[in-house]
């Protein structure tokens, strides 16, 4: 005879950011415009790069893909968060949870690889400008993009594979605002050792490899900039790197806080806040960071507006 404890879970209840009805209403009013700005801003970056011949370079090719990934990253998480603000109880089936987990990890991991690729692109442009056209040829750019997306899919398969092999027969309330693996592992019954270790290893390898690439690239970039005799050349080199460094610092700072810091050093609410930053806020900020601090993007924007008669 089947007991209550043997009943398998078929859906999860997402607890969200808060259980206060007033605060949920305030957060909905705040985060809905954030999501709209994220989608509109990143689509605008993609269209601007596609329609501006002067931006048809590897650097802006990678930026357009970063904008696409940011749309996917935010969309994998934000809609269900907005729904949780409007409902007392937000439920999601196991299949939906697996899909959200997979898409979130895939886009997040791809963003890591793209940020590393963009750092390598800046390294080649500043440290080996005469070899730039050969070392960043269309074939190599396509390879780097393909590898970034493949890496995202492989890491996502590690997470979703562990999730689908978990058994859930007890509590089904996820203490998060989306289906993240580690809160889900806490709800599983039976042995979950592999589900804890395997994703941690794959995520650590992604973070270490991409962050190492970024750090090494910028060490060489800084060395090359300091050797430049022209102040104008140094300023131009710094300006091309500042926006990327800002995006890297914001993204990796919050991701490392969530996935690297010892779990005992922070609370579940602190994890939620950090997760909001890197999944919801940063995808909105990236178009602003790369457009407001980039002369070429601003010039392309002015030319596009002039062509469409938006301003003289």
Curated annotation (Swiss-Prot):
Q: Which residues point to the Extracellular side?
A: 1-25, 76-99, 155-196, 259-271
List all topological domains (Cytoplasmic). Answer: 47-54, 121-133, 218-237, 293-312
Disulfide links within the chain: 97-189
**Which residues get glycosylated?**
5
User: Main localisation, per the record?
Assistant: membrane
Is Transmembrane helix among the key words of this record? Answer: yes
Cited PANTHER family: OLFACTORY RECEPTOR
Under which name does UniProt file this protein? Olfactory receptor 5P4
Tell me the organism's taxonomic lineage.
Answer: Eukaryota, Metazoa, Chordata, Craniata, Vertebrata
């Amino acid at each position: 005879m089947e007991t209550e404890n043997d009943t398998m879970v078929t859906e999860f209840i997402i607890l969200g950011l808060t259980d206060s009805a007033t605060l949920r209403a305030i957060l909905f009013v705040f985060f809905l415009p954030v999501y709209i700005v994220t989608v509109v801003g990143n689509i605008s970056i993609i269209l601007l790069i596609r329609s501006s011949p002067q931006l048809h370079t590897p650097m802006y090719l990678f930026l357009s893909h970063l904008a696409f990934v940011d749309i996917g990253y935010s969309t994998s998480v934000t809609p269900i968060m907005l729904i949780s603000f409007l409902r007392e109880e937000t439920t999601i089936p196991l299949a939906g949870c697996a899909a959200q987990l997979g898409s979130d990890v895939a886009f997040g991991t791809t963003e890591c690889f793209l940020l590393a690729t963009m750092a390598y692109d800046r390294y080649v442009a500043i440290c080996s400008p005469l070899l730039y056209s050969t070392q960043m040829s269309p074939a190599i750019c396509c390879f780097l993009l393909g590898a970034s997306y493949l890496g995202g899919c492989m890491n996502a398969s590690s997470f979703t594979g562990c999730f689908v092999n978990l058994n859930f027969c007890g509590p089904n309330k996820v203490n998060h605002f989306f289906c993240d693996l580690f809160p889900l592992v806490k709800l599983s019954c039976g042995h979950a050792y592999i589900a804890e270790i395997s994703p941690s290893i794959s995520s650590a390898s992604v973070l270490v490899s991409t962050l190492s690439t970024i750090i090494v690239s910028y060490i060489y970039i800084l060395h090359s900039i300091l050797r430049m005799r022209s102040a104008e050349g140094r300023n131009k080199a710094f300006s091309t790197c500042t926006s990327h460094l800002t995006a890297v610092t914001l993204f990796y700072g919050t991701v490392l806080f969530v996935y690297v810091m010892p779990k005992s050093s922070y609370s579940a609410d602190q994890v939620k806040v950090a997760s909001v930053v890197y999944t919801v806020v940063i995808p909105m900020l990236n178009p602003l960071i790369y457009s407001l601090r980039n002369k070429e993007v601003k010039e392309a924007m002015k030319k596009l507006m002039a062509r469409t008669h938006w301003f003289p």
